[in-house]
């Protein structure tokens, strides 16, 4: 039989930063054109502890995400906008101000996402946190989308940061300030040496790092993904059609 390689191995995670695409506005269109979704904070938390041979790359670098953080006029309130559709639409022609998308009147109020008032949680912002504070933090809970994931990530990363860097506190949340008009920014998470901080004041035109995730990888994080061969597809189709024929005969 002729030996043809008809399997396409899909990269579950692909870095879109390059010399020709250094910022968020340049990278996002490439992610979308490659039929991928931008990495989320939750994706990163799933991947970092279980990255196999590439684990040091995942742990020691910062990563931008497709999760957005929207601020109201004046910046007294903010929303965590998971998998922001507005961020997925940006490109090099997108208008921005001070590195943020400016939201038109009424858009902030319409955005779906958990809202927080800075004054209510000011004691938990702009500083490093203990592991227990992270696990109970309402913003980290919103970003992780799953309390068990947040607990696992916090325990493992704190243990490693203690061993490698003698850190007892980390994972602080650092937000934008002085937002005079409603804005939307992309969230990113720092590497472990920088204490795995959450940063919500990303400048979209600075040097950034976006990772595109293959849709198939969302259900199989960390695993290689292969498209089935033509032979496999035909075999399954024939099997399915044969079963259908049997069912029809029974009727």
Language model feature labels by segment:
Residues 1-37, 43-251:
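A binding-site-centric feature that preferentially detects glycan-recognition modules on secreted/surface proteins
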């Amino acid at each position: 039989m002729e030996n043809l390689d008809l399997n396409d191995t899909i990269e579950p995670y692909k870095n879109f930063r390059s010399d020709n695409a250094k910022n968020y506005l340049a990278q996002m269109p490439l992610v979308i054109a490659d039929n991928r979704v931008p990495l989320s904070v939750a994706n990163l938390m799933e991947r970092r502890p279980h990255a196999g041979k590439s684990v040091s790359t995942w742990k020691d670098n910062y990563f931008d995400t497709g999760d957005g953080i929207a601020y109201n006029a004046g910046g007294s309130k903010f929303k965590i906008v998971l998998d922001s559709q507005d961020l997925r639409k940006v490109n090099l022609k997108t208008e921005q101000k001070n590195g943020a998308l400016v939201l038109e009147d009424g858009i902030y109020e319409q955005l779906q996402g958990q809202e927080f008032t800075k004054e209510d949680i000011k004691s938990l912002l702009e500083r490093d946190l203990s592991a227990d504070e992270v696990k109970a933090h309402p913003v980290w809970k919103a970003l992780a989308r799953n309390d068990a994931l947040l607990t696992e990530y916090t325990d493992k990363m704190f243990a490693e940061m203690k061993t490698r860097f003698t850190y007892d506190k980390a994972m602080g949340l650092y937000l934008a300030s002085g937002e005079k008009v409603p804005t939307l920014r992309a969230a990113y998470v720092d590497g472990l040496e920088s204490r795995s901080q959450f940063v919500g004041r990303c400048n979209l035109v600075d040097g950034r790092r976006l990772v595109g995730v293959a849709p198939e990888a969302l259900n199989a994080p960390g695993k290689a993904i292969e498209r089935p061969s033509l032979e496999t597809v035909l075999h399954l189709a024939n099997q399915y059609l044969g079963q259908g024929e049997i069912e029809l005969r029974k009727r």
